[in-house]
C-alpha cells in the first residue's frame, strides 16, 4: 500500500513587531498626514451617512476619509481601483485602513455619496489649519487658470448658434405646413394660428386637434414601398416630427444657457475650448473645463471650475468665492494678461483691491517705444486749452456720440470722435486706412486704469509680485500636470468635476505641507 505523507507547514514564521507604524520612518508622509488630520474634527463631515441595522458592519468612515485624502496627497490623482489595490499591498494605506481593504465600489460610493456635499468644507477647514500653522499671507493672491480636457468625445459638439439657425429654418417649414393644413381645413371651420415662432406644446396640441377632426387612427397608417400615404397621414406625421425636432432644439439651447455657445453630447457641462496642448495637431476645439486657482505661499487658497472660455469672466466668481471662505478680499490679486478688463478693474476698486492684473496690450505699451509714442494714436492726440482734441495736422476731432460697450456690467461707454476734415492731409497714409474722415473711440477712464496698472507693475513691488506669480501660480499647474500626472478631467458633470478638483487641490496642499515640514525637520 502506497503511503502519501503530506507535510502541512509554513516556512515563514510570524515576527515582531506587529504594528505597521514600526516599519515606517518617523518622517514618513503617512505619519505626517495622520498627525495633521488628527487635529481636525473629521466626524462632522460624516453625519449624513445612512444608518443600517442589518448586513455586514460598515468600514470606519473616518479611516475611509483619511485613505481617500492620503491617496490624492501621495499620487496627485488616484483612481478607485488603485485605492483598492493600495489597501492590499501598501503599508501606508494598510496603516490608515487598519488592514482592511474596501472594494473600489465602496470607495466610489463613499466619494460620490458621502463626500460630494462636504468636500468644499473639508477643503476650507484643512486650508485654515495649514494657513494657521504656516502663517500663510492671504493678502497676496497669485491667480492663474488652465483648461483641462473633459472626459468627453472629441467630435460630440453641439453649437448654440447652429441650433438657433436650424430652429428658425424649422419655423419656416412649420409655417408652410400650417398654410397647407389651413387650406385643407377650410370646410371644417378649424384654423391653425400662423406665427413667426412656435412652441413644441402648440405643435403637439395642433396634431391632437388635427387627428380629432379627421378621426386619424395611427394603427391604419401605411409605410414602405408600394404604399401611398394619404394627405392626412403626411400632415399628421409632419406635425409630430416637427414637434419632436423643435423640442430637441429647445433642449439643446437650454443646456447651453446664456453664458456659453457649445456643449458636448457626452458631457453636457463641458464646453468646447481651444487648448494649448494641441496633441491632435489640427487646432481643433476640444471639450474642456476652465480650472481657476488662487495661490498663497505655494498653497491653493481658492479653486473654482468654470465653463467660460475666457479667464476674464472667471476672475469675479473666484474672488467672491475667496471672500465667502475667508471673509475678506485679498489686497493684492496678481494675475496675468488674461484677467485685465474694465469689469475686473472696477470690481477691484469697489472691493478695495489693488490693480495688479495685466491687460492685453501691456507688453506692447511698455516695451515698444515706437508704438507707445506714436503721434497718430488717439491717446497721444494733444488736447488744447479749449478741451478740443486735435490730430498732428491740427484738425479738430468733434464728439459724434457715446455708445455702450457690449458685455459691460458697469455702464461703460466709449466716446466716438470724428475729424472735421481729412481731405488733403499730408499724414493721411500714416493716420487712417479709409477714404473717409478718421473716426476714433476713446475711453478715458479705462486709459487711466491702464496707466495705473502700468505704474503698479513697473514698481519694485510689482516686479516681485509678477515674479512670484509666475513661480507660484503657474508652478502649481506645472506640479499638478507634470510632477503629479493630473492632466485630464476624469469625471463628468460640473458637480462631479468640482468634487474631483477639490480632492486634487486638497492632495496638493497636504503634499506641500508635508514637504515643508520635512525641510524644517531636516534643518533642525
What are these regions (language model features)?
Residues 16-24, 47, 460, 464:
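Short, charged, low-complexity loops and linkers
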Residues 1-31:
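Hydrophobic alpha-helical membrane-insertion signals
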Residues 19, 63-69, 106:
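A general alpha-helix detector
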Residues 22, 55-60, 72-76, 96, ...:
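Short secondary-structure transition/capping motifs
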Residues 26-66, 72:
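Basic, short loop/linker segments at the boundary and entry of helix-turn-helix/winged-helix-like folds
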Residues 7, 68, 76-89, 100-524:
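Anion-binding and metal-coordination hotspots
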